[in-house]
Amino acid sequence: MDKLIKTISESGSFRAYALDSTETVRTAQEKHNTLSSSTVALGRTLIANQILAANQKGDSKITVKVIGNGSFGHIISVADTKGHVKGYIQNPGVDIKKTATGEVLVGPFMGQGQFVSIIDYGTGNPYTSSTPLISGEIGEDFAYYLTESEQTPSAVGLNVLLDKEDKVKVAGGFMLQVLPGASEEEIARYEKRIQEMPAISTLLESDDHIEALLNAIYGDEPFKRLSEEELSFECDCSRERFENALLTLGKDELQAMKDEDHGAEIVCQFCQTKYEFSEADLEELIND
């Protein structure tokens, strides 16, 4: 089971999240049949949203949209405060690597665009904020969003590593944030450690990468573990939800669907689950 660990420095001036999202991203790859670059881009977006959702309370839902003008198209993710996340990428078939190193490329195929966050508190007035994409690598764009939009200086590292068959090997990341009251001396120490930190891909390949991430973040600084929360890819779609969506089309459209198509098939964008509606099902909706 994937997990996210919340920590705070003993001084109370910094907080850090470290997470293992391997099964989450593996499930996303299996459901959407993504190729290498698309897998990494979608995975990074899911991890970013898991971090954002961990910052929320109550029954909030957080939608992250990474909207670029490159080959990927849009990447959409929705997370809740219970550790569930779902998502999809418009173009699952991007598969580009550097010839010399085999490194999976993401940024060049994201293009220019926006990192958008929509927080739905369940009150009918969702809060939307956005920042420009600065690199298209998603991790850097997420850190920029946190610093600019949420006004919280943040360091972020997140990645997805693939095996020789381009299947998800490991996925995860971290977020470090400066809290009010941090001294200049403390900030300088943490900045130095983050700058000297091994590459996120190196840390993810450690036997226990959550511990490796926390050790790299805090060094010799004492810290407290606040909580450990389970994470998973989970879609909340249902037949009832799609029935309600069909009802919004109106009776004339449903009748045409019944007469001309002899039924309907709806595929959930987030998890690829198919819902079949027969002529009898449509007739029932028409008479509802």
UniProtKB/Swiss-Prot annotation:
Keyword annotations: Chaperone, Cytoplasm, Disulfide bond, Redox-active center, Zinc
Keyword Cell membrane recorded = no
Q: Name one GO molecular function term.
A: protein folding chaperone
Which InterPro entries does the record associate with it? Heat_shock_Hsp33 (IPR000397), Heat_shock_Hsp33_C (IPR016154), Heat_shock_Hsp33_N (IPR016153)
User: Which cysteine residues pair off into disulfide bonds?
Assistant: 235-237, 268-271
**Per the record's keyword annotation, is NAD included, yes or no?**
no
CDD domains, per this entry?
A: Hsp33
Q: Where in the cell is it found?
A: Cytoplasm
Q: From the UniProt annotation, give the residues forming the signal peptide.
A: none
User: One GO BP annotation here?
Assistant: protein refolding
CC terms in the record's Gene Ontology section: cytoplasm
Reproduce the UniProt comment on modification after translation: Under oxidizing conditions two disulfide bonds are formed involving the reactive cysteines. Under reducing conditions zinc is bound to the reactive cysteines and the protein is inactive.
Q: Which NCBIfam families match?
A: PRK00114.1
Protein family according to the UniProt entry:
Belongs to the HSP33 family.
Q: What does this protein do?
A: Redox regulated molecular chaperone. Protects both thermally unfolding and oxidatively damaged proteins from irreversible aggregation. Plays an important role in the bacterial defense system toward oxidative stress.
Question: This protein is called what?
Answer: 33 kDa chaperonin
Organism equals Streptococcus thermophilus (strain ATCC BAA-491 / LMD-9)
Gene responsible for this protein:
hslO
